[in-house]
């Protein structure tokens, strides 16, 4: 997405919010999406990027949705916005074996980032949460890092992504087996080598020896009980539970307004990070 501009004074930060919406080919009764993004209260530029669109792929309608939460710059997140879905769909077996195609594309995309000699890709990194909806029926969700995917079914929240926390036993063991370590300093979150607060990312060349970009992948069959999908950056999940986000979104049939209200609630709860939310409503 384009960078979101902001004006600053000595006493106040004024940020611009970006929102939009769209729908699948089924029109009024079909699947609709909306998104809302707003820059956080930090001094750096907006580092969250997103994808939200429907496209035709070999006669199938695909909904492509993603949030990429960058750190140490927005370059890796911007690269993912441009390349990750295209790399997934380049695989000739995508419709036959989506899980394998997604996992392979995540790995290959990260390798291309790490091999790139551009200086703007040297130091930064990004989380990713992606969702691919095939013909309105099959939903494939993948993630690395701590951006979340939440499905509401009959008003109940179910997290469909995994937060890759360095202090998780499995993640810590992986890091330590590669020669890294996890710090637990008072007043701070666990960090890889004292630096990074997630254990799986794209990029981060200086820490890659201790990390990986292997995604968690889950599939969901959309049925009459499936209400909507929320994709959210950690600017939301740090201050709201999954059920709280669902409770806000389910009050609004318009997915753009639902996304805006989730963002507004995160701001109300004093979230300081960049905040991004996509809502895909199935019924």
From Swiss-Prot:
Co-factor note (free text): Binds 2 magnesium or manganese ions per subunit.
Q: What is this enzyme's catalytic activity, as reactions?
A: O-phospho-L-seryl-[protein] + H2O = L-seryl-[protein] + phosphate; O-phospho-L-threonyl-[protein] + H2O = L-threonyl-[protein] + phosphate
Name the residues that bind Mn(2+) 2. 69, 234, 273
Recorded hits in InterPro entries, A to Z, give:
PP2C, PPM-type-like_dom_sf, PPM-type_phosphatase-like_dom
Classification via Pfam families: PP2C
Entry-linked CDD domains = PP2Cc
The name this protein goes by in its record: Probable protein phosphatase 2C 17
Give the organism, scientific name: Arabidopsis thaliana
């Amino acid at each position: 997405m384009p960078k979101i501009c902001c004006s600053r004074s000595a006493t106040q930060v004024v940020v611009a919010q970006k929102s939009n919406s769209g729908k699948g080919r089924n029109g009024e009764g079909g699947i609709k999406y909306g998104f809302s993004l707003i820059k956080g209260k930090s001094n750096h530029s907006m580092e969250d990027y997103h994808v939200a669109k429907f496209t035709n792929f070999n006669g199938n309608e695909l909904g492509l949705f993603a949030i990429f939460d960058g750190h140490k710059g927005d370059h890796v997140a911007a690269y993912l916005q441009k390349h990750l879905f295209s790399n997934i769909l380049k695989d000739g077996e995508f419709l036959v074996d989506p899980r394998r195609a997604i996992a392979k594309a995540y790995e290959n995309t990260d390798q291309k980032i790490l091999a790139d000699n551009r200086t703007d890709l040297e130091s930064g990194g990004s989380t990713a949460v992606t969702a691919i909806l095939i013909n309105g029926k099959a939903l494939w969700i993948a993630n690395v890092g701590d951006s979340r995917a939440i499905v509401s079914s009959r008003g109940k929240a179910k997290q469909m992504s995994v937060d890759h926390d360095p202090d998780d036993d499995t993640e810590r063991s992986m890091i330590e087996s590669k020669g890294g370590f996890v710090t637990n300093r008072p007043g701070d979150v666990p960090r890889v080598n004292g630096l990074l607060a997630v254990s799986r990312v794209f990029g981060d060349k200086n820490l890659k020896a201790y990390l990986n970009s292997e995604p968690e992948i889950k599939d969901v069959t959309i049925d009459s009980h499936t209400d909507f999908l929320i994709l959210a950056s950690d600017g939301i999940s740090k201050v709201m539970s999954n059920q709280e986000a669902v409770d806000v979104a389910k009050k609004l049939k318009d997915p753009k307004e639902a996304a805006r209200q989730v963002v507004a609630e995160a701001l109300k709860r004093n979230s300081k990070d960049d905040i991004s939310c996509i809502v895909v409503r199935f019924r």
